[in-house]
């Protein structure tokens, strides 16, 4: 990861030509207030080591496409022609070489394919919708467990993708993702859903949370399982009443295990089901100055009594998956292009957010993503 961050800024004109100016601005705008020290991978952008978006909405990493062709052009070409030639140098993580990865996947069955179709609900332009409570595959997840315990989630949780953990000492990594959206541009975020807890909406008193996630709990900086980059969001699971409200004294422990308090988050009166209860353009709760991630949630509080159901959720990002053209499958070969191998930990509860929707139209997402272990 340090090697990725140290790379020069991504060539802006190439990136805009590849993804489209609207898509680039959408992702950049979604990351302007990002707290994590680690950037998030942009799936589908070719380049050894990948292209990433970090704090301030800045892109880093070398892009090998966008000179004469866009991602949409490439998808059409992939339908009609053979795949392009393999990139020569890549970051290997759990693999000694590209040949090692191909051998592991081809001869030892260490590739996993995850198929999905998520039928989204109506949105608000600039609002973020959860895909957790919608089907068809994986099926919709259940409502969150009540405070104080909540629930630490894993791959056996209803709504998650099921997979068999790799045998030790192998580790599992994100290789590629393909996405088709019924409306575009749209951006899915693949994330590990770590923990959720139901908030008592009829109460304005503080409500303690004692449950803790089981992944990304290392308090040391620059470790693969550090909470750096873990984020909190407020998920509407049943329509909220027409009552103005804010999320006030909500407390947490940061990526280093220190106690902290969230800045105030403004909720939405009459917030629709599945939309995050955040202002337009915000898909994660801001953290206290200097904090790079949230390790645990310790307290929730709302300024008013509101009808409806809300869950506080902790997640950890895996990759952005842009859909650039309506009803066209964005086909991206992660080995031959942005070979990055973001780690996916054992028992991960993988899920999606539809980040900062570009319109009010409900989007249906269909596709697959692939992991490999080694």
For each feature predicted by the language model, list its residue ranges.
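Polar, enzyme-active/binding microenvironments
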Residues: 2-14, 18, 22-36, 41-374
